């Protein structure tokens, strides 16, 4: 088993607390609205706090698949949110899980900086560049889609 870690940073014009709320507390409602393949997000275990497991269902090219999302830690005061993709058809078979540690920081002009550490836990000793790049692309797409939703809904 190998662990491959990567860091990424993304800026936003949305205020930190508002962006954090959209990316965490309200994401179950927002994500199916802004990411077309995602049909639903449902809690399958837990009460919404650490340890909660969610099933995210998507349809790609007429095929339904899902991933299991486990909330590892949440700290609203420090705007941190850690979770892992722990299973499902949407998790590449070469991976045991993907862990995400995210933090929203104040950015310039009242905006935000989203920092994320991603750890790929592989079954073997190699991480495919394709798997890595797809996960990074999806993460950035999710961030930008939720940011776009907040910007398009000023009363959010």
Swiss-Prot record:
Binding-site positions, Ca(2+): 32, 38
Positions that bind trans-zeatin 3: 133, 136
Name this polypeptide is given: Protein LlR18A
Subcellular location field: Cytoplasm, Cytosol
Organism: Lupinus luteus
Biological processes, Gene Ontology terms: abscisic acid-activated signaling pathway; defense response
Main location: cytoplasm
The encoding gene: LLR18A
Expression (tissue specificity): Expressed constitutively in roots.
Amino-acid positions noted as binding trans-zeatin 1 in the UniProt annotation, renumbered to this chain: 8
Physiological role: Class II ribonuclease (RNase). Binds to cytokinins. Interacts with melatonin.
Signal peptide: none
Keywords: Allergen, Calcium, Cytoplasm, Hydrolase, Metal-binding, Nuclease, Pathogenesis-related protein, Plant defense
